[in-house]
UniProtKB/Swiss-Prot annotation:
One of its GO terms (biological process) is G protein-coupled receptor signaling pathway. The chain crosses the membrane at residues 13-33, 58-78, 111-131, 145-152. GO terms for molecular function: G protein-coupled receptor activity; melatonin receptor activity. This is Melatonin receptor type 1B. The gene is mtnr1b. It is found in: Cell membrane.
């Protein structure tokens, strides 16, 4: 694996990865300026994405930045879990060397990070979806404490 790692994370590739991340960040942020959805919110003492500016834009942001990635990663983890279960069953029946404990521990750690990510970002995104349904009616009904907690 060290040869693959050295090829994937060479100096040139690492510079490209950093540039790609910054480009994607700019591409994700620029539409906010055209929609006018960035405003100072005194509840969280920060400039943030205002979910009541445009329902269709809020839905698009939530789908592209939360629901789609969560769906793809969930699908991938389900496939990995199925593979792990199949390998464990096969190993037990054939008495072959089992899966490395460190590989399984690494997989489990990444899975926990994903679950924590989803758990932390879900409230804000679900509030955004709820607000986008009917901003004038739903937004005032969301308790301020819930909105503030969803940011932290």
């Amino acid at each position: 694996h060290s040869f693959v790692y050295e090829k994937l994370f060479s100096l040139w590739n690492t510079i490209l990865y950093v540039c790609l991340i910054w480009t994607l960040t700019v591409v994700a942020t620029v539409p906010n300026f055209f929609v006018g959805s960035l405003e100072y919110d005194p509840r969280i003492y920060s400039c943030t994405f205002v979910q009541t500016v445009s329902s269709s834009y809020t839905i698009t942001v939530v789908v592209i930045h939360f629901i789609l990635p969560i769906t793809v990663v969930t699908f991938c983890y389900l496939r990995i879990w199925i593979l792990v279960i199949q390998v464990r069953r096969k190993v037990k029946s054939e008495f072959k060397p089992r899966m490395k404990q460190s590989d399984f521990r690494n997989f489990l750690t990444m899975f926990v990070v994903f679950v924590i990510f989803a758990f932390c970002w879900a409230p804000l995104n679900f509030i955004g979806l709820a607000v986008s349904i009917n901003p004038t009616e739903v937004a005032p009904k969301i308790p301020e404490w819930l909105f503030v907690v969803s940011y932290f």
